[in-house]
Amino acid sequence: MNPVIKTFQFGQSTVTLETGRIARQATGAVLVTVDNDVTVLVTVVGAKQADPGKGFFPLSVHYQEKTYAAGKIPGGFFKREGRPSEKETLTSRLIDRPIRPLFPEGFMNEVQVVCTVVSTSKKTDPDIAAMIGTSAALAISGIPFEGPIGAARVAFHESTGYLLNPTYEQLAASSLDMVVAGTSDAVLMVESEAQELTEDQMLGAVLFAHDEFQAVIKAVKELAAEAAKPTWDWKPADKNSALFDAIRAEFGEAVSQGYTITVKADRYARLGELRDQAVAKFSGEEGQPSAGEVKDIFGEIEYRTVRENIVNGKPRIDGRDTKTVRPLNIEVGVLPKTHGSALFTRGETQALVVATLGTARDAQLLDTLEGEKKDPFMLHYNFPPFSVGECGRMGGAGRREIGHGRLARRSVQAMLPAADVFPYTIRVVSEITESNGSSSMASVCGASLALMDAGVPMKAPVAGIAMGLVKEGEKFAVLTDILGDEDHLGDMDFKVAGTAKGVTALQMDIKINGITEEIMEIALGQALEARLNILGQMNQIIGESRTELSANAPTMIAMKIDTDKIRDVIGKGGATIRAICEETKASIDIEDDGSIKIFGETKEAADAAKQRILGITAEAEIGKIYVGKVERIVDFGAFVNILPGKDGLVHISMLSDARVEKVTDVLKEGQEVEVLVLDVDNRGRIKLSIKDVAAAKASGV
């Protein structure tokens, strides 16, 4: 196959799509280049036959950043890329979310997407190029796929408005970082963080991105017209409508009644009984459908029952209307020895959230393509199997946990104080102890509460809410505070977090076409109403950050010294600062501008380290009285140490008003004496007096 190349303009960037030159044995492969800044190779491979043992669609997306792309060699002993970084995992999820709903229902063939960043100038994030490449590779592969999709990143400046596909530099000055993906007529995915933008500004960004990425969809279609392989001859299995009707006639009413049981465990137990009865009645004998087929149809009946009840105005599964938030129970300071803690319960979803303060050295070190960075804020989300009453694998964080943790982090990050105001490293951990929908938004509320409990000076409290949608034909219902079942059986997962003033994070995943601007407006409006309700209840428990840090938190003291004194504090080979840290049990961070941060496990430790540094950096003040120690006696006087590393001379004539024949008649080495600084010459030599101390004290020095 001869290479096919398509070039198009996408906002301020020129994008080139090339296929037919690299990775030709993959089902589909596209090399995407954006402005010669970023190059990503995207491959798609699809299995021709489905694995009959799998009852799900085995799609996997792998985004990987090669260090050679930025002209770097990996750190570490083995000098090769290891397990995926958090950034790679999050980008893999970002690509997966908009493409997954576009594979046809019933398609069970394994599909693997691999996006490899092979070149970057480190000016822009390669994730949009990877998403465009995924769309193009799927479009030319012949695999059944209802695309193509487009994707775009949007920034926002109050003065200039929306900006398409900003650079890292432009993004740093923006109050919005939003990624949007979708088809020519529908938005499928939104991921964003913002600095208290209004709902209208957020919706405007979504619509702006959708309009702009039509250029991507047009270019992908043109590439596919020239380079696409024949579409696979795949058809979904025929549905057994007779079996569906029979099971529904027998169990439909019981299923509907089962979905009125408000307690999740009881509801699941009852529906499990009904499912087992259906399997026993309609399968097992020769010539009857398999148990798997009966279970699938029973699941279809559950799906339709819940949806029809909701769009026809019946109460939801737990008896609520579409706008009511589940009952809240909020506690702070629940763990006595932690720095800050909160227990946030919303219905059957519960998060135990803990905030910990650390020193600058506790910051997360990130080795990225753009270089090494230090991240002073971490938010980790844990979802143990007991939270849903199950046994399961325990171990490191999975993709879902990483994704939920990042969403919660985005939600509260904009409200954290600046590093120069509050220079602590902050780690928040959300332990999901019960789950029935929207645990990530419970983590947002709990994180805000725990941070305020810890005394972190938050700009404003933050709350989050998950919205859902059920749409049948022209009928639709937007649901506030969705349950796990409503998330699973609905058409949209729409999470909004923010303050009373504006939105700080918006995440949206849509499973169907036809989500209109009107529906998104309604969802944002209901989310605002719910968010204000939750914030009101949170503020009754703790309305603002505590004025003092927890007694268990490290004490931090900030100070500044002259830059030419830095070497004195550090000492030869770091000996001085190391000695201070070891002796006071404090940790000390010194910046090139002379800024010093001292962290002590106790206030006494931090104060002791501060005094040591002041002693090293202090200058002798003329006219000030010091208590010094006689270091050395000579014929013409005595050298007295008044500050660490600083000795002054008391001339024999300055020892006493009476005549002194020998210095040793008045002083001895090691003796402590009060001395007055008379002068410091331009060479730093200090002239001291003992005889003038009394007069200086009398005059009020």
Swiss-Prot record:
Cofactor field: Mg(2+)
GO molecular function: 3'-5'-RNA exonuclease activity; magnesium ion binding; polyribonucleotide nucleotidyltransferase activity; RNA binding
Residue ranges of domain S1 motif in the record: 623-691
Gene Ontology biological-process annotations: mRNA catabolic process; RNA processing
Keywords: Cytoplasm, Magnesium, Metal-binding, Nucleotidyltransferase, RNA-binding, Transferase
Gene3D superfamilies, sorted: GHMP Kinase, N-terminal domain, K Homology domain, type 1, Nucleic acid-binding proteins
Source organism, top-level taxon: Bacteria
Keyword set includes Cytoplasm: yes
Major enzyme class: transferase
Cellular localisation: Cytoplasm
CC terms in the record's Gene Ontology section: cytosol
Catalytic reaction equation(s): RNA(n+1) + phosphate = RNA(n) + a ribonucleoside 5'-diphosphate
Sequence positions that bind Mg(2+): 487, 493
Domain KH: 554-613
Enzyme nomenclature, EC number: 2.7.7.8
Role, per record: Involved in mRNA degradation. Catalyzes the phosphorolysis of single-stranded polyribonucleotides processively in the 3'- to 5'-direction.
HAMAP family: PNPase
Record-stated family: Belongs to the polyribonucleotide nucleotidyltransferase family.
Subunit architecture: Component of the RNA degradosome, which is a multiprotein complex involved in RNA processing and mRNA degradation.
Protein name per its UniProtKB record: Polyribonucleotide nucleotidyltransferase
Lineage, broadest ranks: Bacteria, Pseudomonadati, Pseudomonadota, Gammaproteobacteria, Pseudomonadales
